[in-house]
Amino acid sequence: NYINGYDKDSNTIYELKTTIDKSGYPMDIDISNDGQKLVTSYMKIQGTKVQSVIAMYNFSSVGQNENADRMMGSYTVDDALYPIVKFTDNDNIACFGNNDIRTYTMTEKPEERAVIDLRSREMQGVFYNSSCVGYIAVSDSASKAKYKIYIYDNKGALKAEVDYDNAFDKIYATEEEIIVTGDMDCSIIRFNGSMKFNYSFTKNLVNVVPDSNEEEYVVIFENETQTIALKGM
């Protein structure tokens, strides 16, 4: 496998070669917004055991001075898979796995910030921004709601738990809020867990995204779009 990076003029910035024997099978990859850093997730099979290797690279002058392949650090986790790794901003990383969520800070070299135990819950969707991470999971038998949304800061502290009983298909976070859609339902949730907006439209939703104007949102249906404004929110 090769990982190639290019500038806006299609010139090669870097080329990394990985092998299944050494690195494992690629699961996910992400690059920081400034294009200077890279995170990768690989799955390795060691006999009958599975390992995940999360590796971080820095292609700025810092990484150039460190070593030839620009790797600044890596973390090996036994009995785990991390199919989603994301830069939440230029200096922070969230890795979503089958057993936990791991967050890292990487101003220059990576440092682990938090390990958030999923407590055997299966994530149905994940979200993140520069200050928080979270996920939605099927509620346990003690809850009347279909789903529960868990919101953490990037140091791993639980900020809120939200019961969610609408249809669910997509969840994501902006810097201001969490947006959840499914079928004809849409909810906008604040990071403290309070509900900002909850509505069922008359047509199936494709997506809901914030507009450039504050408190306005573009609602995307299969055959049209509408702009809605929230008042008194």
Predicted regions and their residues:
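Hydrophobic beta-strand positions that form the internal "hydrophobic ladder"
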Residues: 35-38, 92-94, 132-134, 178, ...
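Structural motif
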Residues: 2-5, 46-57, 99-105, 142-150, ...
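Blade-level signature of beta-propeller repeat domains, shared across WD40, Kelch, NHL, RCC1
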Residues: 205-233
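Short loop/turn segments that connect beta-strands within beta-propeller blades
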Residues: 7-11, 59-62, 106-109, 152-155, ...
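Repeated scaffold domains used in trafficking and secretory/extracellular systems
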Residues: 1, 22-31, 74-88, 118-131, ...
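A short beta-strand motif characteristic of beta-propeller blades
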Residues: 1, 12-20, 65-76, 110-117, ...
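Intrinsically disordered, low-complexity segments enriched in Gly and acidic/Ser/Thr residues
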Residues: 116-207
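Non-cytosolic head/periplasmic domains of membrane-anchored proteins
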Residues: 2-82
